[in-house]
């Protein structure tokens, strides 16, 4: 992790709607990796998807904008977001097991 974390941010997201069974997690992984973001995404038992994402603020905004749409089969009804300082604990973006 030799790069400086200054300027990097963390966003914790909860994505609601028709977001499970529509390849949302894998599509999010592909999009986050394309953008150079790190973190994880997983399904929640209540039908939502949650993600923790770290990266440069402008790139995070691009990913969050994508989350409001999701893949073609998804129907996103809302995205809740909490911002914080990045920890640098992630080296890539992964799909995690359901919480």
Curated annotation (Swiss-Prot):
Q: Does the entry feature the keyword Hydrolase, yes or no?
A: yes
List the signal peptide residues: none
Alphabetically ordered keywords of this record: Hydrolase
Q: Which residues form the Acylphosphatase-like domain?
A: 10-97
Q: Name one GO molecular function term.
A: acylphosphatase activity
Q: Which residues cross the membrane?
A: none
- Which EC class is the enzyme in? hydrolase
Active site: residue positions: 25, 43
What catalytic activity is recorded?
Answer: an acyl phosphate + H2O = a carboxylate + phosphate + H(+)
* Documented EC number(s): 3.6.1.7
Region of interest: Disordered: 75-99
Annotated Polar residues bias:
89-99
Q: Which family does it belong to?
A: Belongs to the acylphosphatase family.
Protein name per its UniProtKB record: Acylphosphatase
Tell me which species this is from.
Myxococcus xanthus (strain DK1622)
Q: Which gene encodes it?
A: acyP
């Amino acid at each position: 992790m030799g790069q400086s974390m200054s300027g990097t941010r963390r966003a914790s997201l909860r994505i609601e709607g028709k977001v499970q069974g529509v390849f949302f997690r894998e599509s999010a992984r592909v999009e986050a990796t394309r953008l150079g973001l790190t973190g994880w995404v997983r399904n929640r038992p209540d039908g939502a998807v949650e993600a923790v994402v770290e990266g440069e603020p402008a790139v995070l905004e691009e990913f969050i904008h994508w989350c409001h749409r999701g893949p073609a089969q998804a129907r996103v009804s809302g995205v809740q977001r909490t911002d914080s300082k990045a920890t640098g604990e992630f080296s890539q973006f992964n799909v995690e097991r359901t919480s």
